[in-house]
């Protein structure tokens, strides 16, 4: 009898594993197909990824025989179906986002912000406050949500993600300062938005009033201190380990990956949501010091990020339910989207760029481009589900509204950014680009002259000292 029960359990376990394997393999394959489609048609990959996730998730319930999803990301014991038990999906999402943001941090070079550093700082401070207040008020009055739920939604859409900004910048030749502003904002604002969302979430779940507000300020300060301290410390620990040949070349990439995951988890033990800040700081430090084989590390992390982004967006999109979509199927949703894109974002950018030296057309383009990405989607799914289970009124609106903003801004920017760049005059024509081989003194003088006359110049050289001098003159220079 016991042997028969054991065989039955083994058979059920085997069937579950087969389902898990098929669904997971399907997600990976569909994700890579979506990435290829995005490359082929020069659109951000997030767009086809979300559409695929919706198709195998909520939309599939309209045509499956039993009315269930083709892919159910979270295990449902009633349906005997699902990939991740409990909050396993969200733990996976958190770790994956840490790797993605680390890769983004590696690409941030300090020479890029020589002219626009103050603008970036204001965008992630003043711009954040404008978005937080504007989106909070808009969602409250349009959907009659409670103030805490409204401002949780607002905190979640503060972020403009590198997962979306990078493909747009790759496909549109822009002036250096504009690209730098959008790229740095997209990466640095992610941890800020995550921390803001956590503070509002804790306000809803744990405590309210002046006492909690004071505690929230302390927690915010703690998050910043922990994030910077651990990020800097482990960045230099990894740097010296590689520099002293303590890590063999063939293990460098995987050891770096383990550092990223370890730093994220360690940082989270000291301060909630400080992990994202830690990995961004770690990436920034490593990207701006003389780290051997940095390009190889960057290529590895970039490939890994592509895979993780593909999996994440399909899983998170598939996790939405049809009843969530019906909730926001009205004109108020369109009005909210219009407020975020055409009112709140431009106001935030204009206030952040006062006396910045940027031209009006450059400010207009930065205002136009503000797509949301994986951090907004991931945290919205986590907090939305938790608050729904706790019975918080209006919590069911959080996930669909955030996904509406993510999908809407991506679709909007993917289809209009290139055209608006041309209309606003920030688009660099291909014929204006000049490549100079060698970054010697005479080459730098010529390049500077051409740059002042409106030409886009790039210098390449194998000499690191020449490259640094060129970058010090605000020239685009790459190591050969």
Regions from the PLM with identified roles:
Residues 2-433, 456, 461:
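Transmembrane helical cores of multi-pass secondary ion antiporters/exchangers
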Residues 426-480:
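Structured cytosolic domains appended to multi-pass membrane proteins
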